[in-house]
A protein has these predicted regions:
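Short, cationic motifs built from Arg/Lys/His that form the positively charged side of catalytic pockets
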Residues: 15, 57-58, 86, 107, ...
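Alpha-helix initiation and N-capping motif
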Residues: 30, 54-58, 83, 100, ...
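Conserved NTPase motor "head" modules and their coupling/switch loops across ABC/AAA+ ATPases, GTPases
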Residues: 95-174
Length: 174
């Protein structure tokens, strides 16, 4: 039997989410929880999924992936941190090209993995939608797809890396 508590605690003028398992908030306990339980929360605003922004739809898709793959949020967070680090490096006046190349290489690897998982999730959703259509004799088809440059060009690591390198001057502005 496990006692799981989730609460917030004020720390340095900010609130921090605390999760404990049997009164233990260690990293090992949290790893155990993440490996043991998958969960997915649907909210009322999700009905507007198809009218909302692309980032909202990506976040929804990411939550679906996380429900079956507990390490997915770690992948997303690592990707976002790498993007932030790249931007900081680009905005500094003197930077090490080798370090920037290493960060951009990590961005490529993580980005391609995220893209692959999102495509797999969309394929699963499409299969389920098709099954529902067939089971209930629906008179309409619904097919979800990703509409972006990756889909059209089936981008690989080298192209992704080249795009990052070529966009350094532009990205430096942000």
């Amino acid at each position: 039997e496990f006692n799981i508590e989730i609460f917030t605690q004020k720390k340095n003028e900010n609130f921090k989410k605390i999760i404990t398992i049997n009164d233990d908030s260690s990293k090992d306990s949290l790893n155990f929880l993440n490996q043991s339980i998958s969960y997915l929360v649907f909210l009322p605003e999700m009905e507007r999924l198809f009218q909302s922004s692309p980032s909202y739809r990506r976040n929804f898709l990411d939550r679906l992936i996380f429900s079956s793959r507990n390490d997915y949020n770690r992948l997303i967070n690592k990707y976002k941190k790498s993007l932030i680090e790249r931007n900081k490096i680009l905005q500094s006046y003197n930077f090490d090209d080798d370090w920037l190349n290493r960060i951009e290489s990590e961005i490529c690897l993580l980005g391609l993995e995220i893209y692959k998982l999102r495509n797999l999730q969309l394929n699963t959703l499409n299969i389920e939608l098709n099954n529902m259509k067939n089971d209930h004799n629906f008179q309409f088809d619904v097919k979800l797809k990703i509409k972006d440059d990756f889909e059209n060009t089936e981008i690989n690591f080298e192209e992704y890396m080249s795009n990052l390198i070529n966009s350094r001057a532009y990205d430096k502005q942000f």
